[in-house]
Each structure stands twice: as C-alpha cells, then as structure tokens.
C-alpha cells in the first residue's frame, strides 16, 4: 500500500490577507523538500480578527482570492494536492461571510468546497461571549473526497464536536 505523505503548515495568522499570503507562500516552499502528496493549511489562512467591520472590509470573494490563485499554481508546479483549512470569504448578495475549506488537486483544480456548519456561539461568562453566527453563514453539506483511495472528510474547528 502506498503511503500518503502529508505536510501540515502552521503559522500565526495576521490581520491582513497580504501578510498571510506571504506567510503561506514561504511555508509552501518549505514543504518542497518533503515531497508531500498533500499540504494542509490552518483555519482562517487568509485573515483573523474579531472585528466584524474589518473582516467585511478586508475579505475578498472566492474568485478574487490571491491565496486560492497562489495555491492552485503551487499545486500544478509541484504536483501536490492542497487542503486550505479555511478562508474567510464574502459571498455575493450576502451580509455574512463564509468560513470555507478548499481541496485543490495536484492539477490545480478546486475539487471540493466545505463551509463550516457549526458556529461557535457561547457564553463563557458575563464579560465574554462569542457569536460566530453574527458574522458567518453556516454551511449545510457534509463533504468528503477521495485521495489515493483514502476517504478524507472535511471539518473546521468547532465542527469536530458534532
């Protein structure tokens, strides 16, 4: 049985998409020496902040996202599949963003998209609450793909609890 070689990229996301795109590109290049079959990136690979207005102003639509364009090109040039853990993206005619994961084939094609289903809405105490549902639209579909005869399911952060 063939082994599946996976490189997991970890980095502390910044609040600007340009900074994160540069961090991802640097980390993609670092994986080359391992010759992975699959590269995985973290949740919120493009931007992270709790400021909803900043998010709405500084996120892009999927078709305009520089990280997707870069990942597709890298996948082709290096014959590697890429799972973008998630990107925070705008959607046409919607006031909320989506938290979307992508699977890009080694041919540079998006073969799967998954929108986070379970929003993290919680009251920690009187002073601390989190309401992802105020900013993000929940996904509806469970998604999986096959890579080298291995079934891979998608989940983003809080989805793991369900």
Features from the language model and the residues they span:
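Short polar catalytic/cofactor-binding loops
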Residues: 10-15
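A generic short-segment signal for beta-strand/edge and adjacent turn/coil regions
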Residues: 8-9, 51-53, 64-73, 112-115, ...
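Extreme N-terminal starter segment of soluble prokaryotic enzymes
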Residues: 2-7
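Cys-nucleophile CN-hydrolase/nitrilase-fold catalytic domain and related Cys-dependent amidase chemistry
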Residues: 17, 26-107
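Short hydrophobic/aromatic-rich motifs at helix boundaries and adjacent loops
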Residues: 1, 41-45, 135-139
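Active-site catalytic loop in hydrolytic enzyme cores
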Residues: 92-162
